[in-house]
Amino acid sequence: MEVKGEIYRVSGPVVTVTGLQAKMYDLVKVGDEGLMGEVIQILGPKTIIQVYEETAGIKPGEPCYSTGSSLSVELGPGLLSSIYDGVQRPLHVLLERTGGFIGRGVTADGLDHKKLWEFKPVAKKGDSVKGGDVIGVVQETVNIEHKIMVPPDISGTISDIKSGNFTVVDTICTLTDGTELQMMQKWPVRRPRPVRTKLTPTRPLVTGMRILDGLFPVAKGGTAAIPGPFGSGKTVTQQSLAKWSDTEIVVYIGCGERGNEMADVLSEFPELEDPQTGRPLMERTVLIANTSNMPVAAREASVYTGITIAEYFRDMGLDVSLMADSTSRWAEAMREISSRLEEMPGEEGYPAYLSARLAEFYERAGVAESLCGETGSITVIGAVSPPGGDFSEPVTQNTLRIVKVFWALDAKLSQRRHFPAINWLNSYSLYKDSLNDWFADNVAPDYVPLRERAMEMLQTESELQEIVQLVGSDALPDDQQLLLEITRMLREIFLQQNAFHPVDAYSPFAQQYRILKAIMKWGDAAMEALKSGVPVPEILKLESKNVLAKVKYEEKFDESMNAVLTQMDKEFASLRGR
């Protein structure tokens, strides 16, 4: 007979129940409507539950049932191109059942249990298999071959394996001990999926954004944070990363952000082409939409749901990038739940375990050798929304302690319409040194020295700007006036990028290198001309400088760049010939 509890108290999304036999993090059905909730605290006879749906109308005395299992996600063919809410309910299914607004107590399977997939076995009868071993494949999209793996906690010898078209819940393989395997497996979201070993990240995540790839690269399997005030471009940067990063799978979590931003993603991604494969971007994307008007408790679930789906694809040997926009909203949800539980508040009202929860999430990133011997990676990029752009607040500070790349968005840059508004003086990447060999081998041997020179120049420019604001640029020596012009070119030509331009939105490494080298070449030639006696105003009149600024928008980039370099050589030769 099913044991049921009784609601004792309701406080927003937190419900206290008596008489319920449940374990920590068990999934429960709350009230007459059967709202989905999760056990977060057990105090003697009382069980405290956070409810993932609106609790209006629930009253003391209503029943509460434990499912006996923790919050889990369904993993298998059909994940790609899906759009879920925070607890892996497909939004298109909820739309059919309840209309434009999500009804309460509605349950839906994470994967389509009726759709047929063609299963091709790679294991055979008599094979000994263990957790993580691949027993077959399904061609899920044109480019992604979905590997069907044995769940991590199962092992045995195959007594029967089938081939053909099956649903995700059909038995496709039977072990000698009677265990039946399906294409789908369930996994608790709070439990990291096991791996054989973790590895050191050695390859960069190519984002197509010059300031990120060039100055502050993140490694595949790395962690990065994008903190910034409102309107500084966090979401556009995150969306650009989701569109153009060179990973095979993208998991995008809209955690507590505006509904319109998720609507933008939903309308844009199906129409955009993946630059690596030429296929629609949606084919490699899983979207988790948990907007600001959805119940706060589900924000935590959405983050864990997203990282668990990412781990599943990593186990197949794929490179995954996960965008969480924004982790601050998740932290605010934790603060609200914590205050409802009447826990002792920490700094600025956040719970004392804030840093532990953030670390728990970011540490699930990394490069790993999976149980089946494949090497995959998860790169986690979390947006942080500090109120008023104050980077000293707890969420930003705790995130900074964990992540190795910090892309600091600056309100002043965004007000000057400099996008991406990443402040090159405040940002840093701790992966730079470990990726230098990759850049030297795959881009150009002189790429790293060029980058270091550019950073030194930008640093010097910031020091000179203080003098310029006091006495004006005319008071500076000629070489420093010229340096200011070179750094202006670096800022406007190399660092600035238009995320909505058909050509400039994505800049390949070869293109980035040529633009940077051309600016440095112009700067070196200008300094040489200055030493030979040419006045600064004459150098600044050269047309090649203006033409170079337009090259990044040209579809025939190499032709245009070659023409500019030829023009540059001619102009400087004529200057020296005077």
Swiss-Prot record:
Which InterPro entries does the UniProt record give? ATP-synt_VA_C, ATP-synth_a_Xtn, ATP_synth_asu-like_sf, ATP_synth_asu_arc, ATPase_a/bsu_AS, ATPase_F1/V1/A1_a/bsu_N, ATPase_F1/V1/A1_a/bsu_N_sf, ATPase_F1/V1/A1_a/bsu_nucl-bd
Give me the Gene Ontology terms describing cellular component. plasma membrane; proton-transporting two-sector ATPase complex, catalytic domain
GO molecular function annotation? ATP binding; proton-transporting ATP synthase activity, rotational mechanism; proton-transporting ATPase activity, rotational mechanism
Where the protein is mainly located, per its record? membrane
In the Enzyme Commission scheme, what number(s) does this protein have? 7.1.2.2
Chain sites annotated for binding ATP = 228-235
Query: What broad class of enzyme is this?
Result: translocase
The membrane-topology field of this record reads: Peripheral membrane protein
Key words, A-Z: ATP synthesis, ATP-binding, Cell membrane, Hydrogen ion transport, Ion transport, Membrane, Nucleotide-binding, Translocase, Transport
Q: Where in the cell is it found?
A: Cell membrane
Catalysis performed (reactions): ATP + H2O + 4 H(+)(in) = ADP + phosphate + 5 H(+)(out)
Keyword match Cell membrane = yes
Gene Ontology annotations of biological process type: proton motive force-driven plasma membrane ATP synthesis
Gene3D superfamilies, per the entry: 2.40.30.20, 2.40.50.100, Bovine Mitochondrial F1-atpase, Atp Synthase Beta Chain, Chain D, domain 3 (1.10.1140.10), P-loop containing nucleotide triphosphate hydrolases (3.40.50.300)
Q: Which family does it belong to?
A: Belongs to the ATPase alpha/beta chains family.
Describe the function of this protein.
Component of the A-type ATP synthase that produces ATP from ADP in the presence of a proton gradient across the membrane. The A chain is the catalytic subunit.
Assembly state and interactors?
Has multiple subunits with at least A(3), B(3), C, D, E, F, H, I and proteolipid K(x).
Name of the molecule in the record = A-type ATP synthase subunit A
Q: Which organism is it from?
A: Methanosarcina barkeri (strain Fusaro / DSM 804)
